[in-house]
């Protein structure tokens, strides 16, 4: 299998929610690696990942439930733990998830 190289100039951002965009890096059937970009004040609503999730905060500050997060932080959520992200400033995060996201109803 060949190495995959995604140029930043070729990254395709798509709207996820109001003020929240995502860019798939390596996604298959809703699982894999992607970027999430938040405008200050934007929210990713309550959801969980049946297989857990790894988050690296590239830039900005926000809250993941009651946890204050900022650039350089790494968070690993256990499988099935519901959480929401509120951006206090513009935020960029890198997410890796082994299973698709499930949004609360």
Task: Enumerate the predicted regions with their spans.
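Short glycine/proline-enriched turns and hinge-like loops at secondary-structure junctions
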Residues: 48-50, 68-69, 87-89
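A short, N-terminal "cap"/entry segment at the start of jelly-roll beta-barrel domains
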Residues: 1-30
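Short acidic-glycine-tyrosine-enriched beta hairpin
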Residues: 64-84
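Conserved short histidine dyad/triad with adjacent acidic residue
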Residues: 19-21, 26-49, 76-79
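Ligand-binding loop in jelly-roll beta-barrel domains
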Residues: 79-104
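Cytosolic regulatory regions built on CNB/CRP/Popeye-like sensor folds
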Residues: 1-2, 65, 104-105
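Glycine- and acidic-residue-biased ligand/ion/polar-headgroup-sensing regions
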Residues: 40, 49-64
């Amino acid at each position: 299998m060949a190495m995959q190289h995604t140029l930043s100039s070729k990254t395709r951002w798509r709207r996820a929610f109001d003020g929240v965009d995502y860019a798939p890096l390596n996604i298959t059937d809703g699982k894999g690696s992607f970027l999430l970009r938040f405008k200050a004040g934007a929210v990713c609503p309550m959801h969980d990942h049946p297989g857990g999730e790894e988050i690296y905060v590239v830039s900005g500050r926000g809250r993941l439930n009651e946890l204050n997060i900022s650039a350089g932080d790494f968070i690993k959520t256990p499988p099935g733990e519901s959480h929401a992200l509120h951006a206090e400033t513009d935020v960029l995060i890198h997410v890796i998830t082994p299973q698709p996201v499930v949004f609360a109803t």
